[in-house]
């Protein structure tokens, strides 16, 4: 299904709906690869991220010591880098990993967590990492808009809907030669030409710590299906479907967390 979405007064975007049924082909291919994913992610969510990757058939490594990141990033099928939990050592590790990925022509996924004009140190570092051209950039609407210089984000929280950031996502994708994923009530995935909309999910997805970090790591695995755009959208579709199903059987955030991981697990995602 294709819809027309008007942004501002001059730009009219054609947005294609991408659903879970469409994602299954790409998820199968990604699962069969059993890729080794090097994760430099949020310290608060490492356990969740690692288990989610195992659930979808990937092999995670959570190593972030600067003495080891080069070797791990060189050998990984893909690398995901998250700006949460910044320390001097993590900054060094992120820089080294991004550079080795770029120098070796390796893909990597960038999660620019909490970039804003009030966090100049973090945000300046994020722009430095963009010089190493991540293959995928995943963030909420405010983060993506900030990276594209279309919105000065003055809050630690996302204050925009994902649809408000489509134009910024398209421009950022073109400038960075990347696939950009804007997550929200509707996820939008674009390579600068095609725009895919992924609907569904559950309100608890935004209230459980780590779902964004998990999605970024899942994208690092699913894009290895052979098509970066549709692979990234497939990770979004899987997360939305898992959230929907988890919400049917749970009454609070604790049980939802467990049920979400259950519903990410292959091949349970195929059950109706």
UniProtKB/Swiss-Prot annotation:
Binding sites annotated in the UniProt record for substrate: 62, 210
Pfam families per the UniProt record, alphabetical: HK
Keywords: ATP-binding, Kinase, Magnesium, Metal-binding, Nucleotide-binding, Thiamine biosynthesis, Transferase
GO molecular function: ATP binding; hydroxyethylthiazole kinase activity; magnesium ion binding
Cofactor: Mg(2+)
Keyword Amino-acid biosynthesis found: no
Pathway annotation from the record: Cofactor biosynthesis; thiamine diphosphate biosynthesis; 4-methyl-5-(2-phosphoethyl)-thiazole from 5-(2-hydroxyethyl)-4-methylthiazole: step 1/1
Reactions listed under catalytic activity: 5-(2-hydroxyethyl)-4-methylthiazole + ATP = 4-methyl-5-(2-phosphooxyethyl)-thiazole + ADP + H(+)
GO biological process: thiamine biosynthetic process; thiamine diphosphate biosynthetic process
Binding-site positions, ATP: 138, 183
InterPro entries cross-referenced by the UniProt entry: Hyethyz_kinase (IPR000417), Ribokinase-like (IPR029056)
EC number annotated for this UniProt entry: 2.7.1.50
Function: Catalyzes the phosphorylation of the hydroxyl group of 4-methyl-5-beta-hydroxyethylthiazole (THZ).
Family that this chain belongs to: Belongs to the Thz kinase family.
Protein's name according to its UniProt entry: Hydroxyethylthiazole kinase
Organism encoding this protein: Dichelobacter nodosus (strain VCS1703A)
